Amino acid sequence: MSSSRPSQSSTTSARSKHSARIIAQTTIDAKLHADFEESGDSFDYSSSVRVTSVAGDERKPKSDRVTTAYLNQIQKGKFIQPFGCLLALDEKTFKVIAFSENAPEMLTMVSHAVPSVGELPALGIGTDIRTIFTGPSAAALQKALGFGEVSLLNPVLVHCKTSGKPYYAIVHRVTGSLIIDFEPVKPYEVPMTAAGALQSYKLAAKAITRLQALPSGSMERLCDTMVQEVFELTGYDRVMTYKFHDDDHGEVVAEITKPGLDPYLGLHYPATDIPQAARFLFMKNKVRMICDCRAKHVKVVQDEKLPFDLTLCGSTLRAPHYCHLQYMENMSSIASLVMAVVVNDGDEEGESSDSTQSQKRKRLWGLVVCHNTTPRFVPFPLRYACEFLAQVFAIHVNKELELESQILEKNILRTQTLLCDMLMRVAPLGIVSQSPNIMDLVKCDGAALLYKNKIHRLGMTPSDFQLHDIVSWLSEYHTDSTGLSTDSLYDAGFPGALALGDVVCGMAAVRISDKGWLFWYRSHTAAEVRWGGAKHEPGEKDDGRKMHPRSSFKAFLEVVKTRSVPWKDYEMDAIHSLQLILRNASKDADAMDSNTNIIHTKLNDLKIDGLQELEAVTAEMVRLIETASVPIFAVDVDGQLNGWNTKIAELTGLPVDEAIGNHLLTLVEDSSVDTVSKMLELALQGKEERNVEFEIKTHGPSGDSSPISLIVNACASRDVGDSVVGVCFIAQDITGQKNIMDKFTRIEGDYRAIIQNPHPLIPPIFGTDQFGWCSEWNSAMTKLTGWRRDDVIDKMLLGEVFGTQAACCRLKNQEAFVNFGVVLNNAMTGQECAKISFGFFARNGKYVECLLCVSKRLDREGAVTGLFCFLQLASHELQQALHIQRLSEQTALKRLKVLAYIRRQIRNPLSGIIFSRKMLEGTNLGEEQKNILRTSSQCQRQLNKILDDTDLDSIIDGYLDLEMLEFKLHEVLVASISQIMMKSNGKNIMIVNDMVEDLLNETLYGDSPRLQQVLANFLLVCVNSTPSGGQLSISGTLTKDRIGESVQLALLEVRISHTGGGVPEELLSQMFGTEAEASEEGISLLISRKLVKLMNGEVQYLREAGRSTFIISVELAVATKSSC
């Protein structure tokens, strides 16, 4: 299927498409920038944007030189903003290789008087940076410059040797050099006395807490809260959240302003307003500040001997380009602060904990932008706090996107249901004449079906003449394609696109036969865009040539006036699915039978290996629970205990027989009743809480009745129908560790006695001082991580010890790093911290999962001097039990998915078989042929019944509802025997029907498909147990018992006899449910016997010399005509 903007469902294709769009957009950005540079004051913004948006190679630069020059200028500018100065150093010698022209004056206070003869500036190319700062400052700077992840130590506080003035040195590493931004510490500002992110995190603590307290489910609420918090934190006049759409254009989705400013909420702007190169820079340098767009830029002087040009991409001081400054001034924004919102891109790394797993791909979701009408400077610590806040915001955006993705998956499932529903109708007219119809399949403004030269239209569509025009165009220019999807018929080259007006811009069309087509239509994007910006005052006119938000909005509307909302990949998948179904609906029955055979082959492939795997896992799970050295107990849906293993009995002193039957809440401490009650209630709803701490009572003769403390995970027990039937609690006894921690918190003096104690009860403990340096690392941590105390002490806890790249203990991803920082920050600010799940890769590459508890360390005056972090590890048995549980769940889920797929795939060809049979029934058939069709119909009904069996437990437990249908035993018996004929013929087994004619023609009432299923299963088992050349016979009797004037109860007894040694005893034990493990055939017999029991019957098996017999008895009803 062709597409002017291809819609592919694969991730690789989507990325390729995205990369191609970025390259094309960068070329357009370069052309626009070149026009701006050439035009100067005569630059016409609106017309330039319109020109660059027009398709066609003639509009693009004639060569790559324009693009290369543009990218070089963006990345390697030679100017900085004047609110600070910049030095570039040789990484090995610490000598200056480049400096900004204002650096000598700012850092060495060069006199403005005329210098005396021979006087040289104190700072220039080749100067050793250590000579211009005080001794302690030079030492701190040298230590930072030798650091691996140098940016983790930002900012470094330094003092000039000549003036004593304090500066923040902000360092980052680029290829072959170190770049240092120096920003003066303002007189009113309390200088940050040590490096480390923790110092900045404190500034954003309130905002982070509010973001984390938000309920999920509303991206709008999340964005509104973010702009409100940044507004209060930074004090800018306007704060906005920009979101980038799939086609790279942007939209203001949240905004807050001071009174008197025009709102920009709802503003859409072209992709060129924030060029791709600028977006790349935002990914590298996530916070960007412009203090004064009118300030004169300062040149950077570079050593002429350098073999390369320095890049200032990572420098906050980097000067903005003139076109951006003009845009700012036109909108009366003199200063700005921009934070990048970077989220995960697509289906990347899942929950795998493999240490070799790469980090997730990232993409720029949007920006948080602050504007001010006057110059404004934000100190580095506050900018760092804003960057961290943006990372927390990005994590929540990720979660909202994942939630939207889940809703999307549900919509896809709904779509599949619609497709199946459409298939069962009169194809294809039912999909337009009934409800739901094809407009319910995807979001659209209109749809049409062209079938047998007739047009059936829904909603807003082209006229019949225009639609035939589109078909002719498709047939001429897309001959080899099965369809077309485009968001702009104009851009796709359809000659009559402009005549369609605003009603039809985008179209998805698919061919369903030689002359049959399906169409979906969308109107132009501008119809869905609403701008909440300021309205024009009477007499006011806009200058469209200037770069301004209102001009951007007009330019955006101009660009999209012939374009609709793009077709999503999942929408095209749904359309393709319907296309395939309709194209295949007319295939003959042989093709359907072939498909059915393939499905049956897949079913046969799903053999005993899956069941044995599940059974082995289940058996191992039961054994582990019974013998585990961790407490495990379980309750039913009423909260009454039905499981109580040896370890929990040992800890509580309550034997198993006394515990079973008690309500769980009667056994826990009063202080824990609410916690356990909530945990139990959520678990019964399927919401499994983890790492919940509560206390449970102890029993016994000893005087010590202190409760035991447990950390508990709830696991909902489910039946085959996925209904919750109970809750299993897997716990860990932390009484000893809790006592140690309680003792620790009470200690005022020698805490080292605990930290350095090698006793096995002491958990892994590490600590940090108030500046973020690792200050404690006990022997348990060394054993757990493989890193010695000397390896980690005096390293940055966040980044060097625990980080995402070159850290000792690597965290799984950036989200884990940010969450860890939030926990440490909250504890440092005095907040109570609950235990959280924590994980990292040890030195040997093994992933460690544990619970993290953070406690603040206080001095005698009560001031926070650092943090202690305790890790609680699950025991080996518990880890193994949880591992086995995960394996069991994964295996079960895998098998369920396969079964769900096969059940779904069976239904389509089955519907085709039914359709073919109905078509045959309408033809002239002989009596024998009609009988064959009736047998086929009986087998199809039986198969449908089995496909509907999603809850086997209901059958086993006797809760299945049986149907009451009128039938003749002859029809059921013939259909049952037909299912074994191929196998019996293959073994040359003779089938003898000893049923009397009267019995076969008796009219009975009951669940005939279920009776047929039962007989077919027992017949198959008998055939399997009969030697080749043997004999199988079927006989039966019917005993009637009148229970009313018009109804008689009938006891039907069917005997299936076969020669040979008989059915194996093991298989019979499985049928009667006495075996814990059952084979595929055993489960089939067990289900059949349970179905017989549901019919008030029973199954027996008799062995005789050389012959064995199944005796199946069931209760049915016989209807008699009442006398008139």
Swiss-Prot record:
Post-translational modifications reported in the UniProt record: Contains one covalently linked phytochromobilin chromophore.
Sequence ranges assigned to domain PAC in this UniProt record: 690-746
Molecular function GO labels: phosphorelay sensor kinase activity; photoreceptor activity; protein homodimerization activity
Residue ranges occupied by any Histidine kinase domain in the UniProt entry: 901-1118
Annotated PAS domain residues: 617-687, 747-821
GO cellular component, one term: nucleus
Residue ranges of domain GAF in the record: 218-401
GO annotation terms (biological process): detection of visible light; red, far-red light phototransduction; regulation of DNA-templated transcription
InterPro entries: GAF (IPR003018), GAF-like_dom_sf (IPR029016), HATPase_C_sf (IPR036890), His_kinase_dom (IPR005467), HisK_dim/P_dom (IPR003661), PAS (IPR000014), PAS-assoc_C (IPR000700), PAS-like_dom_sf (IPR035965)
SMART domains: GAF (SM00065), HATPase_c (SM00387), HisKA (SM00388), PAS (SM00091)
Biased composition (Low complexity): 1-14
Transmembrane segments annotated in the record for this chain: none
Keyword flag Ribonucleoprotein: no
Binding positions (phytochromobilin): C323
CDD domains per the UniProt record, alphabetical: HisKA, PAS
Sequence segments annotated as region (Disordered): 1-20
Keywords: Chromophore, Photoreceptor protein, Receptor, Repeat, Sensory transduction, Transcription, Transcription regulation
Record-linked PANTHER family: OS08G0260000 PROTEIN, PHYTOCHROME 1
Job of this protein: Regulatory photoreceptor which exists in two forms that are reversibly interconvertible by light: the Pr form that absorbs maximally in the red region of the spectrum and the Pfr form that absorbs maximally in the far-red region. Photoconversion of Pr to Pfr induces an array of morphogenic responses, whereas reconversion of Pfr to Pr cancels the induction of those responses. Pfr controls the expression of a number of nuclear genes including those encoding the small subunit of ribulose-bisphosphate carboxylase, chlorophyll A/B binding protein, protochlorophyllide reductase, rRNA, etc.
Protein family according to the UniProt entry: Belongs to the phytochrome family.
Assembly and oligomerization: Homodimer.
NCBIfam families referenced in this protein's UniProt entry, alphabetically: sensory_box
UniProt-recorded name of the protein: Phytochrome A1
Record organism: Nicotiana tabacum
